């Protein structure tokens, strides 16, 4: 299945901002073709300093999820 995940959540909402990346990892690990599309505030999450500072409640830090997304070779469109 092909999946496109879009998000506009930025660092001000760390839990919501991390969901697209955690979901992308789950889809990729299940064998689906997945892409992430970021718009608005979410674009800032691609800055290393911002990604390192985003720690969602009850989930792994965004930097860890982002590293997995990159390892899965999931395209991220900004």
Please annotate each region the language model reported.
Residues 52-78:
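A glycine-rich helix N-cap at a beta->alpha junction
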Residues 34-39, 76-78:
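Short internal beta-strands
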């Amino acid at each position: 299945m092909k999946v496109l995940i879009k998000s506009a959540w930025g660092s001000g909402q760390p839990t919501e901002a991390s969901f697209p990346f955690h979901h992308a990892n789950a889809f990729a690990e299940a064998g689906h073709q997945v892409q992430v599309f970021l718009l608005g505030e979410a674009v800032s999450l691609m800055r290393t300093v911002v990604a390192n500072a985003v720690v969602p409640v009850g989930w792994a830090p965004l930097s860890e999820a982002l590293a997995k997304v990159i390892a899965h070779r999931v395209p991220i469109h900004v």
